[in-house]
Amino acid sequence: SPVNQVEFVKKLYDEKLPFSKRNMQIVKNVMLSQDGFGYEIHSKTGWTREKGFNIGWWVGYIQKENGSYFFATRLLQNRNSNRADFGSCRKDITKKVFKELHIINF
């Protein structure tokens, strides 16, 4: 669930998972997907097909000087109405929300 995804990402961020701190830092570095504009986005995408639906995820956190913001976006699409932009809209929708909340500016 999205809640479980955010809880997991928070544990990774706080380095409270049952792995070495070094390995958790490596994972966080690999998850760095955008840097600049006064913030970093650390994230991971996912996509599966289940019961006639495409299910797309974008999970991670935005790190700014004044704090961090965690997110999990899950989109469902009926496979009978495939849209070419389904893969990119996970990120686009999430970024628009954070922009409207004045958390990011790009």
Feature map (PLM): residue ranges:
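Structured C-terminal helix/loop/strand segments within mature extracytoplasmic catalytic/sensor domains
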Residues: 6-106
